UniProtKB/Swiss-Prot annotation:
InterPro entries: ConA-like_dom_sf (IPR013320), GAS-SHBG-PROS (IPR051145), Laminin_G (IPR001791). The gene is Shbg. GO terms for cellular component: extracellular space. Glycans are attached at N274, N397. It is found in: Secreted. Residues 1-30 form the signal peptide. This is Sex hormone-binding globulin. Homodimer. Coiled coil: none annotated. It comes from Rattus norvegicus (Rat). Disulfide bonds join C194-C218, C363-C391. Isoform 2 is only expressed in the liver.
Length: 403
């Protein structure tokens, strides 16, 4: 084969991988050729997220000289509108690409010596359904189908790779191998989603014996929401969330519970030295409000109605629908509460405190602070096992332990 033909083939393979979502695996795994039909039916769905941040689920090194089949297919589902499906490169400086979601639509970002582009296309796919995706090479074009419909056609671009001797490529699933800031249009990398029935250029990746076996939320029926398995937590700095009104001083938050189970901490307002100035606990389907030495309040929890917590200069009120419980406290105690917002370690925490034993799990449809929706991706810190955009349809043994 002539040198120019080899370069052209390598260019096509790079563009092919540009549009290809790869199967999630782990480092240390090897590739083997298998029957595609058997692969698609036998392999379990795999979870894409590796927690907050940009760390990928796995990183693969691909030998571009051993690609055996120029077509690929897979199914994926998510309620998450934004995140990385996969990132690939031969080097992070001038030859990388990314396939992900933004506002629920597929997006490709490409950066190399011949092209720098960003393309968003197709319908919104973050509807919780399994969407089949197929990629084929047709003459000089690459075709992409979603749900059996052609969504994208890229014509080949003539570019010589004669001075680009690398024949291997890194593929990172569910994350990035370069800083998020180096993307042409940065996004939140973590994606709460799953892939199944994936065939990759006639091959399928096999998990190593030491690979993490968690399926995340891929083996249960889902609904949209924010799910905290037992023992998980998320922490927001009070300086980073909507601030209290000042005249008069008031602060409110609202939690829309879709399901709750177990017993333990739901919410905390405090600081690093006093981690629980005000706390909401779940016990026997009842929310218990406590504030240090003050008497406790209990409110039976009705799933489906928003739970509201309101603070002002005279009281703390907990309500749900027509039911309300009020905790009257001293001005001295309330003054210390107001100072939480000026304290550098003032925080709002959801779920169990770090290291705390808790069996409570819950799903939130919404989390509002001062009338504004709070984004879990903006948390100061959060547990790896939180499902950021999905919840189980009902409590089950599968969700009583962290993944």
């Amino acid at each position: 084969m002539e040198k120019g033909e080899v370069a052209s083939l390598r260019c096509r393979l790079l563009l092919l991988l540009l549009l290809l979502t790869l199967p999630p695996t782990h480092q240390g795994r090897t590739l083997r050729h298998i029957d595609p039909i058997q692969s698609a039916q036998d392999s379990p769905a795999k979870y894409l997220s590796n927690g907050p941040g940009q760390e990928p689920v796995t990183v693969l090194t691909i030998d571009l000289t051993k690609i055996s089949k120029p077509s690929s297919s897979f199914e994926f589902r998510t309620w998450d509108p934004e995140g990385v499906i996969f990132y690939g490169d031969t080097n992070t400086e001038d030859d990388w690409f990314m396939l992900g979601l933004r506002d629920g639509q597929l997006e490709i970002q490409l950066h190399n010596l011949w092209a720098r582009l960003t393309v968003g296309f197709g319908p919104r796919l973050n509807d919780g359904r399994w969407h089949p995706v197929e990629l084929k090479m047709n003459g000089d074009s690459l075709l992409l189908w979603v749900d059996g419909k052609e969504m994208l056609c890229l014509r080949q671009v003539s570019a010589s790779l004669a001075d680009h001797p690398q024949l291997s490529m890194r593929i990172a699933l569910g994350g990035l191998l370069l800083p998020t800031s180096k993307l042409r249009f940065p996004l939140v990398p973590a994606l709460d989603g799953c892939i199944r029935r994936d065939i990759w250029l006639g091959h399928q990746a096999q998990l190593s014996t030491s690979a993490r076996t968690s399926l995340g939320n891929c083996d249960v029926d889902l609904q949209p929401g924010l799910f905290f398995p037992p023992g998980t937590h998320a922490e927001f700095s009070l300086q980073d969330i909507p601030q209290p009104h000042t005249d008069p001083w008031t602060f409110s938050l609202e939690l829309g519970f879709k399901l709750v189970d177990g017993a333990g901490r739901l919410l905390t307002l405090g600081t690093g030295t006093n981690s629980s100035w005000l706390t909401l606990h779940l016990q026997d389907q009842t929310v218990v409000l406590s504030s240090e030495a003050e008497p406790k309040l209990a409110l039976p929890l009705a799933v489906g109605l928003p739970l509201q917590l309101k603070l002002d200069v005279f009281k703390v009120a907990l309500s749900q629908g027509p039911k309300m419980e009020v905790l009257s406290t001293s001005l001295l105690r309330l003054a210390s509460l107001w100072r939480l917002w000026s304290h550098p370690q003032g925080h709002l925490s959801l779920g169990a405190l770090p290291g705390e034993d808790s069996s409570a799990s819950f799903c939130l449809s919404d989390l509002w602070v001062q009338g504004q929706r709070l984004d879990i991706d903006k948390a100061l810190s959060r547990s790896q096992d939180i499902w950021t955009h999905s919840c189980p349809q009902s409590p089950s043994n599968d969700t009583h332990t962290s993944h």
